[in-house]
From Swiss-Prot:
Gene (name only): pheT
Ranges for domain FDX-ACB: 721-814
UniProt name for this protein: Phenylalanine--tRNA ligase beta subunit
Organism the protein comes from: Rickettsia prowazekii (strain Madrid E)
UniProt superkingdom: Bacteria
Documented EC number(s): 6.1.1.20
Length: 815
């Protein structure tokens, strides 16, 4: 949000310095990102006077100008279309650097004629994109003076960062109101001249859905002259980067930036059959504005997928979810976002319909995002408009047009909808403020601050009944009121207290353990990512049932309106974005919170792999990641925590999360505690994110993972046996429903003194085996710590193992 000091002073009696204003704005939560002073940036450019001109002897489009400067008369070659004698202009002397292109002015020869400087345009000084001609200054400008004070550039510009909840300060008046509450100046009363209406509009206004359009107002204005707006208005808009076009357009921009209420002007002569406004959602119920007859244009949900051509010169295909303003010839505007090209105003416009309305913020935001249209109107409408000021803004705009555009005929206001009802009071107390902020204020001090901010208060003993003003849509709970009091009272007045001493406890041990988990995965080639804990509810419902308590009351955007039930959507989204950039091989992990409901929050270590493994090794052709890769990585993490995936955790295939493949994923538990899941991501999830390669992931609930003191942070001592190891291969035929992991786990524990490792190297099922059977082939490493195993020892082990497998799993040794 940009505004100038003079713009602020239109609404605020203030004598404070620019520095004091900037500091006060930041103190009350309106962070000042920058203060721009064009007079300092352009102080070397001076006023000059063109005494006379003559044609360039070698170039028809160039002129030789005799220019009066503080250093005498200089010859300057100029090709601007408006260059002429007897005008004051902006001169860049030799040695000065032009802002556009950082061009340093030198004495030059242009087509055989010397030139000793440059006459500047707005574009060259980066004041606008206007390059049609050189800047013309007022006749009373003094030659040699800095030109900025004659061109309205001695007006400091404030650039503030407005948070999404503060739509009320997207107008300079709202900023002035906050500064006044802080004690920096006095808010001026708005001067509202009475508008004498000369006719009743015959335009019929229909609104089908109050939720989509709670208030729509307009006036007809006839016989106006759409001439250029006055200098003061042009300069205000130019200083904040808004292109000036005509009186009508400039007034609508001025009202929008002054009061945060978008205004739109339609050329009434371009509306076929007159204009009428309808807002409906495929419904027969109509809320009509009485005493109007000609119904030819409608504000409605577009259900004909018609093309809409906007004033930005682009065409858009609207859907039934977009709120459109139409007449008999088609769509004339996208409600709350942008007007249509067909009914746009130009210099010859004489009759207009001036609209001020409030639209559903969520609908405006959704349409703007889908169609990728960013406008000032959308920016304000999607942050909620003060419905109680809408008609007042329309009247201010009407008065301004009447004062600029000559004697006009004005209709009565045509309106459908009502002002916003007064909010319910909240019971606030001194004790609540002290409890959550530590600030002790009297009831009178609290009431004084709130009244200055526009709140209605009523003291009942120790309780203040507080009603938020209509422009503060973000005030809903007691904490919101406390925040308002503190920001005006001053954060700098809050006394600092000594922090309690820190003691080493389980939180520190937990931190160390998580750091170790990160190092393990990083050493295996994973990249750590940190993503937002909020996500789109549309995406979230693919991963878990939506819970009412997890919706954000005041989301930054609709894409971040829900607390994530799992970290996986964020990681899968990263995979999708990387694939779009032709990055196909990925391994990511994140440690972050997931939310079951408002009362249950768990910290998860989530990892994801996709694409090829070891594809950069020149000695290997590489292979694609598979489920055993993610399982192996999870095993290493769990083993570091002092547990074992095979020995301590019961593998459970029941009730898998809906985003995993139903037959290629498993849950992992420690007793009754669910520790997480690992496996392949469901194809429907991949399709939703437009991913065409397999993804494998694990989720480990660190909150449920016990801190095992005896094991944590320690490794068993690694010893090398003095005796030879022996390897034996076995192939067992077992029933298909026997889990391979269970069999391997059993063999590992069959003879702990001899079995050092078990590796699966083949699984087969086919025509050569009986129906319902499968063959698993394993390699076992056998080694004793006290002797070399003899052939008798090995044969005895084999006989015992085969017999045990037969008894436990009804397996037979395959010949």
């Amino acid at each position: 949000m940009k505004f100038t000091l003079s713009w602020l002073k239109q609404f605020l009696e203030i004598s404070a310095s620019v520095t004091e204003i900037a500091e006060a704005l930041t103190d009350i939560g309106l962070e000042v990102e920058e203060v721009i002073d064009k007079s300092k940036e352009l102080q070397k450019f001076e006023v000059a006077y063109i005494r006379n001109i003559k044609p360039h002897p070698s170039a028809d489009k160039l002129k030789l100008c005799d220019v009066e400067t503080k250093n005498g008369i200089l010859q300057i070659v100029c090709g601007a279309s408006n260059v002429r004698a007897d005008i004051k202009v902006v001169l860049a002397n030799i040695g000065i650097e032009i802002p556009k292109g950082n061009l340093k002015i030198k004495e030059s020869v242009i087509r055989g004629q010397k030139s000793y400087g440059m006459l500047c345009s707005e574009e060259e000084l980066l004041l606008s994109s206007n390059s049609d001609g050189i800047i013309e200054l007022p006749k009373d400008a003094v030659v040699g003076d800095n030109f900025t004070k004659y061109y309205g550039l001695d007006d400091p510009i404030f650039v503030i960062n407005v948070t999404p909840n503060r739509g009320d300060v997207l107008g300079v008046y709202g900023i002035a109101r906050d500064l006044s509450a802080k004690g920096l100046g006095t808010l001026k009363e708005l001067e509202l001249s009475e508008i004498k209406s000369t006719f009743f509009s015959k335009i019929k206004l229909n609104v089908h859905d109050k939720e989509a359009c709670p208030l729509f107002t307009f006036r007809e204005i006839r016989n106006l002259k759409n001439k250029p707006s006055p200098n003061w208005l042009q300069q205000l808009l130019k200083n904040v980067g808004i292109k000036t076009i005509s009186s009508l357009v400039d007034v609508t921009n001025y009202i929008s930036h002054s009061f945060g209420q978008p205004i739109h002007a339609y050329d009434a002569d371009k509306i076929y059959g007159g204009i009428s406004v309808d807002c409906y959602i495929r419904s027969d119920k109509v809320i009509s504005c009485k005493n109007h007859e000609m119904a030819t244009a409608v504000l409605q949900f577009s259900n004909d997928s018609a093309n809409f051509y906007a004033i930005n010169g682009k065409g858009y295909l609207l859907t039934e979810n977009d709120l459109a303003i139409k007449d008999e010839s088609g769509i004339q505007g996208l409600a709350g976002i942008i007007g249509g090209a067909k009914s746009s105003c130009n210099d010859s416009t004489t009759n207009v319909i001036l609209e001020a309305a409030c639209f559903n913020a969520k609908m405006v935001a959704a349409s703007g995002r889908r169609l990728k249209i960013d406008t000032d109107a959308r920016y304000r409408n999607e942050r909620n408009i003060d419905r109680n000021f809408t008609e007042k803004a329309l009247n201010i705009a009407t008065n301004l047009i009447l004062s600029i555009c000559g004697n006009c005929e004005v209709s009565e206001v045509v309106k459908v909808g009502e002002q916003e009802p007064q909010k319910k009071p909240l019971d606030f107390s001194v004790y609540f403020l002290e409890k959550i902020t530590g600030i002790k204020l009297s009831i009178q001090e609290i009431e004084d601050i709130l009244n200055k901010l526009g709140f209605i208060t009523d003291v009942k003993g120790d309780i203040i009944k507080v009603i938020a003003p209509s422009w503060r849509h973000d005030i809903n709970i007691l904490e919101d009121i406390a925040e308002e009091i503190v920001r005006i009272y001053g954060y700098d007045k809050i006394e600092s207290i000594k922090l309690p001493e820190l003691y080493q406890n389980n939180n520190l041990r937990e931190y160390k353990r998580i750091s170790s988990f990160k190092r393990i995965l990083a050493s295996k080639g994973y990249d750590e990512v940190v993503t937002n804990s909020f996500m789109s509810s549309e995406d979230a419902k693919l991963f878990a049932e939506l819970k009412e308590g997890l919706f954000l009351l005041n989301p930054m955007s609709i894409e971040e309106n829900y607390m994530r039930p799992t970290v996986l959507p964020n990681l899968i989204s990263i995979v999708s974005k990387n694939l779009a950039r032709d990055v196909k091989d990925m391994a990511f992990f994140e440690v972050g919170p997931s939310f079951v409901n408002l009362n249950i929050e768990s910290t998860y270590l989530t990892a994801i792999i996709s694409g090829a493994f070891n594809n950069k090794n020149p000695h290997s052709f590489g292979r694609n990641y598979d489920i055993f890769d993610i399982k192996g990585d999870l095993e290493q993490v769990i083993e570091y925590a002092g547990l074992s995936l095979d020995k301590c955790i019961v593998i459970d295939e029941t009730v898998l999360p809906q985003y995993y493949h139903p037959t290629r994923a498993i849950n992992i538990r420690l007793g009754k505690n669910l520790l997480g899941h690992f496996g392949q991501i469901h194809p429907k999830i991949l399709k939703y994110y437009d991913i065409n390669q397999e993804i494998f992931a694990f989720e480990l609930n660190i909150t449920n993972l016990p801190l095992i003191k005896a094991k944590f942070g320690k490794r068993d001592e690694f010893t090398v046996s003095d005796y030879q190891a022996n390897f034996r291969d076995y192939s067992f035929i077992v029933d298909q429903d026997h889990k391979v992991g269970e069999i391997i786990s059993y063999i590992k524990n069959f003879n702990k003194k001899l079995v050092k490792s078990v590796m699966l190297f083949d699984i087969y099922s086919g025509d050569k085996l009986p129906e319902g059977k499968k063959s698993i082939a394993i390699k076992i490493k056998l080694q004793a710590d006290d002797r070399t195993l003899s052939e008798t020892d090995l044969n005895s082990f084999s006989e015992d193992l085969v017999a045990s497998i037969s008894q436990k799993f009804q397996g037979i040794l395959r010949e």
